[in-house]
Amino acid sequence: MADRAMTRVHSVRERLTDTLSAHKNELLALFSRFVKQGQGMLQPHQLLTEYEAVIPAADREKLKDGVFEDVLKAAQEAIVIPPWVALAIRPRPGVWEYVRVNVSELAVEELTVPEYLQFKEELVDGSGQSNFTLELDFEPFNASFPRPSLSKSIGNGVQFLNRHLSSKLFHDKESMYPLLNFLKEHHYNGTSMMLNDRIQTLGALQASLRRADEYVLSLPLDTPYSDFGHRFQELGLEKGWGDNAKRVHENLHLLLDLLEAPDPCTLENFLGTIPMVFNVVILSPHGYFAQANVLGYPDTGGQVVYILDQVRAMESEMLLRIKQQGLDITPRILIVTRLLPDAVGTTCGQRLEKVLGTEHTHILRVPFRTEHGILRKWISRFEVWPYLETYAEDVANEVAGELQATPDLIIGNYSDGNLVASLMAHKLGVTQCTIAHALEKTKYPNSDLYWKKFEKQYHFSCQFTADLIAMNHADFIITSTFQEIAGSKDTVGQYESHTGFTLPGLYRVVHGIDVFDPKFNIVSPGADMSIYFPYTEAEKRLTALHPEIEELLYSSAESTEYKFGLKDKTKPIIFSMARLDRVKNMTGLVELYAKNDRLKELVNLVVVCGDHAKASKDLEEQAELKKMYSLIEEYKLDGHIRWISAQMNRVRNGELYRYIADSKGVFVQPAFYEAFGLTVVESMTCGLPTFATCHGGPAEIIVHGVSGYHIDPYHGDKAAELLVDFFEKSKKDQTHWDAISNGGLKRIYEKYTWKIYSERLLTLAGVYGFWKYVSNLDRRETKRYLEMFYALKYRNLAKSVPLAVDGEAAVNGKICTLGC
């Protein structure tokens, strides 16, 4: 059994003991207050509220000289089981310590991770005692693996990895042979690239590179590679160095410099020039994945938009690189999703669909099936688990048939796509990239501790297990923001929340993931700039759409597309667009607007969510629909609000953002948590001032007061006042609105474009593919551990999820596991 503290054993215990000795009465009063409330869990805001209520201001000033206030502010939760109070303390992102205070004796003890989790389990099972509880611990497999120690290094994994491994691998001539072997074995569909068999030693490589460089320097810079390729073959060099003499010279020099004086930047630049990625498979099984008429359907939103924009940018970058590398290879990208025979007016029943705006990218749809048949209908993303093992095998077969080759990179999306990506990458030995989009454990508070309460509706035991498998199996993980990995000073990151947690009665995660792991890289997406562009670019504006946009916003009649109306069309508009579910918190926006009379005087509210034309099958959406109607009726919002059904037309949505900007309105994103916030980027790219949740990605996208504003959805009254203040200032001074609009645009151009994204992603794929080849980066030991965890734990959990009822005869097929 594991028996370790996560970091810095004793330090907090010693400091707390000293503080208790110096301020016994004050702290006894506080901890007694905690215990008096009885058994339970206290959140950070509750701890600070009690601290301010119990300790007088003068005494709090005295305590500031010690460490207690810092410890309390760093506490992410307190578990109270009288007479004990246990604290989970997070001094900085990614670093955790655990202590327990006996209030009766004022004694402090340090807890190991298993001890803390076992104590926490007593909130559920009453005793926390078990003869044996499975503990999941990945730390021993990574103990000898390098990782940074500074929080600022989190999310910059490839830079750290290059620094460390370049110094390790290139410390002498002999250690460079893995690079030589990598270049010699590099090929595509049996055709050699970079080097041929004429070069067998490093000395021969350097000599050939120098002779080749002398030769190309004698040629005009624009001489095509085809004119001198035969000469290069004689020197032991094959295609892949460049398309003309100038580029070949640059790339030859990169490798010569690397062999002479290795450094991480030169290494990354050189690896970025090697042709490595030609076939990409992107997995996104759940929901309705199509190019039209699906946005707003259950489980269908930002992830679909993200992937469609992603593949267009990736294909462009792949084509550019292949051309610059002097190759005649056609790249392929396959977006693999679920085929839905009951396609309900979409193309989701079509096996193969070309992606518009691309030449070589397709959506490949593969159905869910069991021995009872093919599943015809849509099912929630929370119910997909029993289908994924068979699905992974079916997808592998379909992909092999389509590509006639093994993919070079597999990218998973969300929990289901990442699990299927893990199964496929494990079987094929392919580089795997994980993109979470959202990890559900952080969206539903205490859904780990009280997982049994959520199990019937959400099956979180399967999902959390799948997430742990995927994040530990991946070669690299990309996130849109730092917060997604490690949160902020005050909030825990999505991945960080998987460091240590418990599913009582199932297993304890002693060490689930390390946010300092160099597999983490921040690669932020952008908006499609052919659709989303500033409202000031008059020559590009789609004015032909204005009549239907005006009808959408202001028509006095109601329809299946919009309900309620706006009396005063001259007011600016608060605009929001999202799925209608609890986390997106659209009803929270309506409520904060409804409760602020001054805000209602200043502006109208337009929300785009849900579907008035059909009854929802989604339980959360049903509850939010009911709440929305109730708020509109209670606060008599008709005349102030326009409620529009989910809009499928992205082109019109882009012009809708700009039309709202014409009214000098704003965009509000009120989610309780948002992993990234594509709509935030879209609105800012259109020049629309944006107010967005402070919980998650938008807190990084927006610089508060410069390129937009942060709002706290848990404090709707303060968010409403912030909006009132903005509109009142803008009413008095037009330049105030303009300043935020321009600040948002500047921020986008600096950090959030698909061009930057695609360049970075393909470079990462090459770098991690190289390191996987030349080092132990494939983490074989971890993957064997994962095979056992998958077979003994995940598989049984998946079987416990009820199958949907419908189908037709299916063809028998082999079942794939992590060990196959």
Swiss-Prot record:
Catalytic activity: an NDP-alpha-D-glucose + D-fructose = a ribonucleoside 5'-diphosphate + sucrose + H(+)
Pfam families: Glycos_transf_1, GT-B_Sucrose_synth, SUS_EPBD, SUS_N
Record has Repressor as a keyword: no
Any one GO biological process: sucrose metabolic process
Assigned protein family: Belongs to the glycosyltransferase 1 family. Plant sucrose synthase subfamily.
Record's function text: Sucrose-cleaving enzyme that provides UDP-glucose and fructose for various metabolic pathways.
Protein name (record): Sucrose synthase 2
Organism: Tulipa gesneriana
